[in-house]
Amino acid sequence: MTYNFKNKLPNPHFTDLFDVTPQEVLENTKDLTLIDVREVSEYTGELGHAAGTQLIVLSTLPEKLKTIPTDKPVVFICRSGGRSSQAASFAKANGLTDVYNMQGGMLLWNQLLLPTEK
């Protein structure tokens, strides 16, 4: 099943991947699994994190991939969108199907003044 995001955009680095806007992630949080792939210090640091995210540091993703719930679409998040694009592409290549990258990461999330936790 593929989630029907209103504003999904082709990812500029991975042709098999779509980006979704921070606003749409916030609006649909309850219907999504949010995975933040930053380091612990970034997750709890200045930019904070979106409510409801699960932290899986990118370097640990290969061994933790099978722990990610697949009953909802999965959106990967990082600081600016680079690491989360890598994570989403890796997840797709390894069997997850309804996978997205959050455009602009937590930098854009903060620029848009969306709520964060620390």
Model-identified regions with their sequence ranges:
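Short, surface-exposed ligand- or partner-binding patches at beta-edge/loop junctions that are enriched
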Residues: 77-78
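Rhodanese-like catalytic fold shared by cysteine-dependent sulfurtransferases
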Residues: 1-33, 40-73, 82-118
